[in-house]
Regions:
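Conserved catalytic core of the tyrosine transesterase superfamily
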Residues: 1-292
């Protein structure tokens, strides 16, 4: 029996294949569950039109929100909005619900200079002892972590980079697979440019524009975000960094915290250069791929 049976089942499968590469295993599990609920609802009301009006979305939100917290309801709405945004960008007419505003108490972990030094030291000497399908892990993890830290990228965006997305003439990365489905340019410094170039030469992929920068089983498939997370947990543990945050509502050290650390350090650097945080926000938001 097919898991998705609505009129948008084919589009949903394509969308989920992208989201699986972008999200952690746990985040993807929750996201997929929401999509299944929405697909089931479309089947339940016998919706056969290749468009989704406001009435359908609002009715689903009303039904799915019964007996759950405001935060959970907000998460459902956010998830289905991402699916609908994908459908809109695919040429379908769909209503986009507004995400509920809830009180955000999340406290991110910020890596210290000492943390970063330990992480890179362990990553640079990583040895995968057990048999692994991905023979490139020991080479790709050191660079992948440096990109997360130095450029503030999302994990899903990073693993989707192809060699052809690197512009060594302008020292830019062209991000094509992004959370908001909007292509954007990310600059990198001269030191990272040299590391990237030498890495591509060493991997034998410099002249293959379709090769993934971080291969999976071969250069024309990429390592999954889940596997990156698994290998990072090994590195983090060897580096002696506690994954359990002692602060209330804290997340603890994780891959996404490289992005938070990048943002905070960018604000600090700008303030030292006389640029107020309020003036930095629009530029940093655009750089990070946020709507605002």
């Amino acid at each position: 029996m097919n898991e998705f049976n609505s009129v948008f089942r084919d589009e949903i499968k394509i969308h989920l294949s992208v989201r699986e590469a972008e999200l952690s295993h746990e985040a993807y599990r929750h996201y997929r569950r929401t999509v299944i609920l929405f697909d089931d609802y479309l089947c339940k009301i016998q919706h056969t039109d290749k468009e989704i009006p406001e009435s359908v979305v609002e009715s689903w939100i009303k039904e799915v929100s019964v007996g759950i917290s405001l935060n959970t309801s907000s998460q459902y709405i956010h998830h289905v909005r991402q699916l609908l945004l994908f459908l809109v960008n695919s040429g379908y007419k769909c209503f986009l619900p507004r995400t509920l505003i809830t009180h955000d108490t999340y406290v991110p972990y910020l890596y210290s200079d000492e943390d970063i030094e330990k992480i890179f030291e362990v990553a640079d000497s990583l040895v995968v002892t057990r048999a692994a399908k991905n023979k490139y892990v020991e080479k790709e993890m050191p660079l992948l972590l440096r990109l997360l830290y130095c450029c503030g990228l999302r994990v899903g965006e990073t693993v989707s980079i192809k060699v052809g997305d690197l512009d060594f003439d302008r020292d830019l990365i062209i991000l094509r697979v992004t959370k908001k489905y909007k292509q954007r340019l990310v600059p990198f410094g001269k030191d990272l440019a040299e590391i990237l170039y030498r890495y591509c030469v060493g991997m034998g992929i410099l002249n293959d524009s379709e090769a993934y920068l971080f291969p999976g089983e071969d250069t024309h498939s990429h390592i999954s975000a889940n596997n990156v997370g698994n290998y990072y947990r090994i590195i983090r543990k060897k580096a002696g960094i506690d994954s359990h945050c002692q602060i209330k509502n804290g997340r603890g050290a994780c891959l996404h915290c490289f992005r938070h650390t990048f943002a905070v350090r960018s604000f600090d650097k700008n303030e030292r250069n006389g640029i107020k945080a309020s003036e930095s926000v629009p530029f940093l938001s655009t750089y990070l791929g946020h709507d605002s």
